Structures are given as C-alpha cells and as structure tokens.
C-alpha cells in the first residue's frame, strides 16, 4: 500500500481516545469515534529530513494516518477533529475489509497567525483493493510534495494544466461545487413552478448559471 520510502516509516499506534477525551467534543462525534473507528496507526512522517528534500514554506511535515474502520464509511467530522488537533498536514488512509481509500484536506494556516490550521475542503479517492492504492512522492520541497498529493487524490476535480496554484485550483473547484448546487436547486424549483412566466424567468437564470459553470 502506497509504496512510500522506508525512511519515512513511523508505524506507531495512536489510541483513538486521544482525539476526543478531555476535549470539547460533542457526544455525537464521540460516538462516531467509538462506533466507526477500530484502530489508528501513524504510518509515515513525510518531512524534509525523511525524504531528503528541501523544507517547504507552508508545509513542514505530512503525517500519514491509517484509520481502520469497522465498516467502509466514516463521518467527515472525524477527519476534521483529527486535523484540528494535529498541527501538521495529514494524509488519511482509510482501510476496511481489504480495501483502502485515501483522503486529504486542503489545509491552510488560520488567519489568526497562530499555529492552528483550517481545512477548507477534503478530497478522496474511490475505494480500491489495498495493493492498488499507490501515491507518488513528487516535488523538490515539502510544499510541492503536498500539492502533488492533493492533486493525485483529487484527480479530475482539480485542474492541473493551467499553471494555476493549488489554492486557485481549490477555489475554482469550490465555485464549481456552489454553482452545481445552485443549478440543482433551481431545476427542482422550476419543476414545481406552475406559472409559465416564472418558469421562463427561472430558465433564463439557469442558462446564466450553466454558462458560468462552463467557463470555470
């Protein structure tokens, strides 16, 4: 699985309780940790020292956490809680019944200037047999390695041939997502509308939204 260099291996088990005990976590989220997660392993530490590359300006380390699940689904709030508690970028590998799925958040430093991070969006692969999940370490510094991993996992969701930055690609993807949501909502509303003049107005608005989506 993954095929990362031996120099990056860490292989330590983390008690899942560390992510919710003595923290301000809702009873619902605590129950998700208990019910959905079986084990958490810290598999790799991707860093300048373990990869023999240059440090990054925004990314110092990428931790690779294997999360073994009781069933092949996990509430995204769990990943956000773990990301919130770890002051580094994290690559999650979810495993269940011989299959794996990679998740990674687009993680930025919080505007407050503290060491805290905020995750704007998660990207993930499809579920696949464990031996088929392969990610490559590409880049001459940690910032480039992180960008490469996000783009590999996001696949077609993030544009790769325009020369835009990762931040710009993520923002473009978020705009697409919002437009698609608006279009779906307006289509549903138009189907329920009885008045012809209102249907025509909505159809004109739909065309505008679809044109905006096409140019992104």
Range-by-range predicted roles:
Residues 1-97:
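N-terminal, leucine/charged-rich tether regions that mediate assembly and partner docking
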